[in-house]
Design a protein with these regions (language model features):
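Ligand-binding clefts of soluble mixed alpha/beta catalytic domains
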Residues: 1-353
Length: 353
């Protein structure tokens, strides 16, 4: 049997395609039948224009001998990643790491619009501890090599969850802001938040002392519709905040600088995080609201080693090519080349306070 489970389901009443490796068969290591089925999952998402949810727990390719000899499949075989790319260009793709994930399943995991890993059960690795020890001389546990403490900080995954049920809930929350496919608009919810609601705390949230930091997340929470705000990638590129929220019931992408981290300066990681978020909003037609408190690119020797100027320029170029509506609010400052990324083409710009 194929060691990949595939089917249809519903999330908040919307149909989705869902699939994942069966770890009880060869540890989820891709077999010919399992690989064909995983490609078929992506084909179904494209054909029926449905969101794709992947639940991963599988090893990389097996080096063991099979009783039934067959010609090996080339790692660059087009269907493997053409189907992944086509799915991501057509419908939302959300992935969860629920156990140890390595090799090809790990590559599919990160090839998604949103990824989450279970803090208690999941690890993501190119190769496992035994291979790493033999090849590199590093003796590490699976968690030390590829646990949530590693991959939420380097941007391999967007978020961590306490356990598998919370990982599923995060996928549900992510999908509720997005359309079923790129040919539709995001679902607008009934808004019970009065348009004349006043947030008096905003009057004093910005310190008069310009060297003092403040809580940008409080500003975002106060301005958006009352209710949940879904943050992505909080542990990575920490000076930049990326959220999905609603404004008058309309799903929007929200980007803000975090003055509590490097005064909000854009790092290489922050630039990559912003670029990826802008691409998500562009693909699924989400307007962007940007709260700008940008001192510029982070400076110093580490910043130069990380090629911050290159990654930052790429973020600015991505911003310049977007077509979605864009509104920017200058909260305190907006300096340097880095500020360019915060204002999309023909942005509606406000200065506050």
């Amino acid at each position: 049997p194929a060691n990949f489970v595939l089917g249809f389901g519903k999330i908040d009443g919307r149909r989705v395609v869902v699939g994942g490796e069966d770890f009880t068969l060869k540890g989820g290591s891709p077999t010919e039948a399992g690989l064909r089925k995983s490609v078929y999952a992506e084909d179904l998402a494209v054909k029926y224009r449905l969101p794709l949810v992947r639940l991963h727990e599988g090893a990389g390719g097996s080096v063991g001998k099979s009783k039934h000899a067959s010609l090996p499949s080339a790692v660059f075989n087009a269907p493997r990643f053409r189907s992944v790319a086509q799915a991501m260009a057509t419908a939302p793709v959300a992935s969860a790491a629920l156990g140890a994930v390595a090799g090809l399943p790990a590559a599919r995991l990160v090839s998604s619009h949103f990824s989450v890993m279970s803090n208690s059960t999941a690890q993501i690795m190119i190769a496992g501890p035994a291979v790493v020890e033999r090849a590199m001389g590093e003796k590490l546990t699976k968690d030390e090599l590829g646990g949530a403490g590693v991959h939420t900080k380097n941007g391999t995954v967007d978020n961590a969850a306490v356990d598998e049920p919370e990982a599923m809930e995060q996928i549900r929350a992510f999908l509720c802001y997005l359309p079923s496919n790129v040919y539709e608009l995001a679902p607008v919810s009934l808004c019970n938040d009065p348009v004349d609601r006043r947030e008096e705390r905003l009057l004093e949230i910005i310190p008069k002392e310009r060297r003092r930091a403040y809580d940008m997340r409080r500003i975002i929470k106060s301005v958006m519709d009352e209710g949940p705000v879904f943050e992505m990638g909080r542990g990575y590129g920490k000076s930049q905040i990326m959220c999905l929220a609603r404004m008058n019931g309309q799903p929007v992408g929200v980007w803000g600088n975090d003055p509590k981290v490097l005064a909000g300066a854009m790092t290489a990681d922050g630039a990559n995080k912003a670029r990826r978020f802008m691409e998500l909003c562009e693909v699924f037609h989400l307007p962007i609201i940007c709260f700008v408190d940008e001192p510029g690119f982070m400076i110093g020797s580490q910043s130069e080693r990380e090629a911050t100027i290159r990654h930052g320029a790429n973020a600015a170029l991505t911003s310049a090519l977007l077509n979605v509506p864009w509104a920017s609010v200058m909260v305190r400052k907006s300096f340097g080349v880095a500020q360019v990324a915060h204002y999309g083409p023909d942005a509606y710009v406000l200065a506050w306070p």
